[in-house]
Amino acid sequence: MTGAAVSVCLLYALSVCSACYISNCPIGGKRSIMDAPQRKCMSCGPGEQGRCFGPSICCGKDVGCWMGSPETAHCMEENYLPTPCQVGGRPCGSDTVRCASPGVCCDSEGCSADQSCFAEEEGDNQIGQSEGSNSADVILRLLHLADHTPPHRVHQ
């Protein structure tokens, strides 16, 4: 074989195999990340009452959710830690989406309103129905308004 053919074969083999390189290998090799115990995601928000759901999302059961605000700045550090974290709450969609706050379902990309996240709150909380539903209704209305706002306003 010629040198060019050997080079092409080598480059093809290199692109097909899945290797981790020195700059992005986890400690212990690429398979060690699967064996590592999952840890809770970092706490965030006022009084550290919330948990990070993504680099700019902080949610807590009693405090609601923040997205892209100063309360979420601490969550950026999660990107630099070598082991993955597991957020609390029960699944409310796919494997990566979890109940973050009463009526709110989040993953690392964003949040949405989800009625199934109220069931967890009702079972855990013994306060009156009207007291718990008022804050949940406000959250749902805010999420609803955020989903339906136009991308820009046309001034007349």
UniProtKB/Swiss-Prot annotation:
Q: Which residues carry this modification: Glycine amide?
A: G28
Question: How far does the signal peptide extend, from start to end residue?
Answer: 1-19
The record's section on Pfam families has: Hormone_5
SMART domains found in the cross-reference section: NH
Instruction: Give compartment(s).
Output: Secreted
Q: Which GO terms describe its cellular component?
A: extracellular space; secretory granule
List the keywords (alphabetical): Amidation, Cleavage on pair of basic residues, Disulfide bond, Hormone, Secreted, Signal
Please classify the protein's predominant subcellular localization into one broad category: secreted
Q: Which InterPro entries match?
A: Neurhyp_horm, Neurhyp_horm_dom_sf, Neurohypophysial_hormone_CS
Q: PTM per UniProt?
A: Seven disulfide bonds are present in neurophysin.
Annotated GO molecular function terms are:
neurohypophyseal hormone activity
Q: List the disulfide bonds.
A: C20-C25, C41-C85, C44-C58, C52-C75, C59-C65, C92-C105, C99-C117, C106-C111
**What protein family does this chain belong to?**
Belongs to the vasopressin/oxytocin family.
Q: Which PANTHER family match?
A: NEUROPHYSIN (PTHR11681), VASOPRESSIN-NEUROPHYSIN 2-COPEPTIN PRECURSOR (PTHR11681:SF13)
Chain's role: Isotocin causes contraction of smooth muscles.
Q: What is this protein called?
A: Isotocin-neurophysin IT 2
